[in-house]
Amino acid sequence: MQYMILRKADASTEAGELPGPALLAAMGAYNEELAKAGMLLGGEGLQASSKGALIRFSGGKPTVTDGPFTEAKELIAGFTMVEAASRQELMEWLQRWPKEDADGNTSLEVREGGCPGGVRGVAAKGAPALPEGFRRFMILLKANDRTEAGIVPDSEWLGRMAQHNDEAARAGVLLMGEGLKPSASAFRMKFTRGKPGVMDGPFAEAKELLAGFWVIQARSLQAAVDWALGYPFPFRETEEVEVEIRLLYEAADFAAA
C-alpha cells in the first residue's frame, strides 16, 4: 500500500533555515534504509511558504495571493512517498525517524495514497535533469468537506483530470502526482524529545488537510501558478477550493549555502 508521509512545517522551516549537516546525514541514512527495504518511492523538501502562492477558487473564480501563508495553521515542510505492506510496518519505521530533526520534536502526518475517484497517479522517475532556468514546484490541493467525505466528481470531470495529467506527463511538465484518501484512514505521529505519540484520523480541520498533489517543472512561480489555474481541480467550479503552490529545494540550494 502506498503512503505519503508529511513532515509539518515549524518556525525554523518557515524562516527558510536550511537543515544542518547532521540532519542531512541522518535523513540521508534513513532514506537509504527505506530504499534498501524497497519502500522508498520519492521525497522532497519544500521551501518556506514565503516563496509560494495560494489560489482560492470561489464559484469558479480564482484569487491568487503571494506567500507567506500566515492564516494557515498547518503547513508542509517536506514529504516522503513509501510503499508499505501494512500500516503497522510503516509505524515501526516512523518510530525510528531521525532525532536530529527538530531536536526530536517533529510532527508527521501519514496519509493513504490513491485518488478516491480512480484517477491514476504519476510516479516519480528519479531526480530529473531540469532544463536551464527551470525549478520544480509542488501543487497542493487542500481538502474540503466533500473530499473528506469521499465524494468524487462525475466520470466526465474525472476524465478531464486524467487527460490533463497524461498530457502534462507526456510533455515533461508533470513529474509526479497522486491523490490522497480521506483522513479517516490517516494518523499523526508527534515526537516530543524523541518519543512518539500517535493520533488516529479522521481530523476535523478539513481545510488544513491535503486531498492530492502534483510536482511540476516551470520557469517561474508565475508559470507554476498559471499551470495550476488551468488544472481541472475537483469542485473548483462550484465549491470553495484552495491550492498551494510551493517551491521545492534542489541540491544546488544546499551547495550554495
Language-model features, listed with the residues they occupy:
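Conserved, structured core segments of small domains
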Residues: 1-257
